[in-house]
Amino acid sequence: MDKLFVYIDGTARGEPGEAAVGIAITTPDGSVVEEISRLIGRTTTEVAEYRALTEACRHVIPYEPSSVVFFTHNQRLANYINGVFETREPHIKHQIEIALGLLNQLPRWRLNHVDQKVNMRAPRLVEQAFHQSLQAQATRERMELVLLARVATLSDDAMQRLLDYADRLREEE
């Protein structure tokens, strides 16, 4: 593959809080190669931004592009990765080292700071990860309520069989 454009974003809901990354990998003409939208656990927005960059690198490297242009609306991330500024925060230094280690596996790369309007796709993917998580949680809660309602109507013998069956299911996982 010749050249790829990669749009990245990472956000936490709370500082720290549940965090997600959004990554859009495209060709220069805008054709989508891959989109990543996923929760990454509990962290800060700053760390989530670096995690978006490192995860983007891990997805891009197998395509073996001749060059990659990354886009972020996080000026601080762009400045640190591009060596404009240095951080004194050890946990951020560690994130930078990881990112640079992956970036340097690419033949040519560049990280550009862009206006948030240019980088709209990645934040939408972040929101998609949060939304899917909420939907999954709501679905699970509904299933639990239905299960509780049905269990409440069972006889003691049927409830014991259900408990035995649940134990077998847990052992299989």
Question: Language-model segments: which ranges?
Answer:
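RNase H catalytic domain
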Residues: T11-E15, T54-F130
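Short coil/turn segments at secondary-structure junctions
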Residues: I36-I40, G83-E86, V146
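Short, low-complexity, charged amphipathic interaction modules
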Residues: R140-E173
